[in-house]
Amino acid sequence: MKQFIGKGLCATLLAVAFANAQAATAHALEVSSEAIIDAPQAEVWNAFTSRAGVESWMVAKASIDLRLGGLMRTHYRKEGELGDDGTIENTFLSFDAPRMYSMRISKPPATFPFANAWKTVWTVVYFDPVETGRTRVTIRMLGYGDDKESQEMRAFFAFGNQYTLDMLAAKYKAVLPAKKPAAQ
């Protein structure tokens, strides 16, 4: 009987250790950034999903076709043109307005330093009302590999996504990060 209990306990401990290792690995394969924005959910949704909204705080130029398979094309340079080699193209995978949308990089800019890692990641952006007139925005990027290039890109977006949220918070004059990304 003791031997049976000992084997059962050992199996349970191994299962818990395996689950914890998987959870730690999964965390290393994603980026999560969030901020509380001093604006209502519908307004923040519009700031992310309309050309005028995105151009008011994030990029110099944009075109957004918010539908399944539609493109979000953005350009950070005023002198650039949508469609040139500096354009970033993302394809919408899903959306539930005004709560969330997901997208995948379909064409990075020509100077993007990560030749292959972008091909496996996708982004989910959540918009949660937290109190009257305020919205929690969470950006999660998933699908990173454990290879060097993918982890370098993960660090790039850990900084970049939080910077993006900080810019949005500044637009609404409430620089209140809910949490910073984990140390890289």
Predicted regions and their residues:
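Beta-strand/loop substructures that line and gate deep hydrophobic ligand-binding cavities in soluble
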Residues: 111-159
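Short, highly charged C-terminal tails/helix-capping segments
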Residues: 170-184
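Hydrophobic/aromatic beta-strand elements that line small-molecule binding cavities or substrate pockets
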Residues: 33-35, 61, 87-94, 120-129
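A short, structured loop/turn motif at beta-sheet edges
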Residues: 38-42, 66, 93-101, 126-136, ...
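Bacterial N-terminal signal peptides that target proteins for export
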Residues: 1-10
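C-terminal segment of classical bacterial N-terminal signal peptides
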Residues: 15-22
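Short beta-edge strand/loop motif at the mouth of beta-sheet-based domains
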Residues: 52-87
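Amphipathic alpha-helical segments
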Residues: 38-57
